[in-house]
Amino acid sequence: FETALLKLSFWFSLNYLALNPDKSEATLLGTSHRNLTLADISAVNVAGSTIGFVDNIKLLGVTLDKSLTFRKHIALTSQSCFYHIKALRHIRHTVDFSTASLIAHALVSFRLDYANSILSGSPKTAILKLQRVQNTLARIVLRSNRFTHSAPFLERLHWLPVHSRIRFKLATITYRALSTSSPHYL
């Protein structure tokens, strides 16, 4: 563990980088059993700087927790989406269908799609929270009440359900990795 930290410190110095301990965070990723065995480590020292451990870190817009359950990421994504859905709900009566659909894609759908391939192994209950976001969005775009079944709305809007979007994204990534249009490291 310490040799890896020394190598990291050496790499920083080779690339003229300085570690800012005030902005740096560390976490231990693994199973809950493995994390319990490493619970006695409270901080790490890298090049004389002490970095404390946190339960969740944000990396490229994805919130990672220690056990890689993505619960916090799904909760934050849902919260952000519902904030924008609320804004769309307030203006929905003033815009036509095509504009509402465009706003829905611009403000909410991309949040559901961003890095969703990492959720492929998540339990259905976790994906269901994101599906509720999409169902609410479809109801607002189509001006329907909240008690109507949402599957016909998704079909009418030509939107895949969230679990299908995840599978489609994985299939797309796989196809691009196998085709000639992908970078050599994939």
Give residue ranges: language-model regions.
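Hydrophobic/basic alpha-helical segments
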Residues: 1-186
